[in-house]
Regions:
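Conserved beta-alpha
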Residues: 103, 107-166, 246-248
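Periplasmic-binding protein-like
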Residues: 82-87, 135-136, 191-198
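Short, flexible loop segments at boundaries between secondary-structure elements
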Residues: 166-172, 214-238
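N-terminal glycine-rich anion-binding loop in soluble enzyme alpha/beta folds
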Residues: 2-71, 137-175
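Hydrophobic structural segments
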Residues: 4, 17, 41, 110, ...
Length: 248
């Protein structure tokens, strides 16, 4: 095989800044998370061990196992991520604000680089948008959903109303129509934004049209996770028509 002269070859391979994604065992939306990633950045995931049982409070509490979460850093460390994101909403809010801070700090100390959790990212996103009142839509059962409402209250975020789908498995299969209807029928008035929980609930293509319909930002768990992780490395997310991406 004859190769062209050196001058005819493209420069490469491309230089990319890597983000390490620590995911729960059942995360199925890696492809959606990647849609917010700009050129020059790549996302690399490691998963915590599989746990049997439905997605209920017991499983969520078991997911928040620092040893298992930090073991993922060992799996990803060889490629030297510039930042880490723990991509599970419920496991990062289940122990409240103190628990979220402790988890994020444990990841930062173990990795030696900046880190964020999904719940911390959601709070950062609401702060960036100057939002203090939200309506909450979640796929979980009511027990987990109310734990999220309590977490937000700890952060001085007022929840005007909330609704849940009551699901305990296969959340990634929820149709956009189902999520949109859940958001439209949320109780209460006066919310400055809608918060859409769970990194296994698909949202990318819903955000812009729902924001246009509702007239307020729609902040999803996946959107906020990638947005916050990119901010740690000085980059911006890709999300045409999405308030969080375009206003902050």
């Amino acid at each position: 095989m004859t190769l062209p002269a050196t001058g005819g070859l493209p420069e490469g391979p491309p230089v990319r800044t890597r983000i390490g994604l620590i995911a729960p065992f059942d995360l199925a939306l890696d492809d959606e998370l990647a849609r917010w990633i700009p050129d020059g950045v790549s996302l690399h995931a490691a998963r915590t061990p599989r746990l049997p049982g439905p997605v209920d409070l017991n499983l969520v509490e078991r997911l928040n196992d620092h040893d298992q979460i930090l073991a993922c850093i060992g799996e990803l460390g060889a490629i030297e991520p510039a930042a880490y994101a723990y991509a599970c909403t419920a496991a990062s809010f289940v122990d409240g604000i103190t628990g979220e801070h402790a988890l994020a700090e444990a990841i930062r100390l173990a990795a030696g680089v900046p880190a964020v959790t999904t719940s911390g990212a959601l709070l950062a996103a609401l702060t960036a948008l100057e939002v203090r009142t939200v309506a909450v839509a979640a796929p979980y059962d009511i027990v987990i959903t109310e734990r999220l409402v309590r977490f937000l209250a700890e952060a001085a975020i007022t929840v005007t109303g909330y609704g849940s789908l009551g699901l305990t498995s296969r959340i990634w299969e929820v149709p956009y129509r189902t999520t949109a209807e859940l958001i439209r029928r949320l109780p209460g008035t006066g919310a400055e934004a809608v918060l859409l929980a769970c990194t296994n609930l698909s949202s990318y293509d819903l955000i812009a049209p729902l924001e246009a319909e509702l007239g307020v930002p729609v902040v999803s768990a996946n959107q906020a996770t990638v947005w916050a992780a990119l901010r740690l490395i000085g980059r911006r997310a890709v999300g045409p028509g999405q308030a969080l991406v375009e206003r902050t």
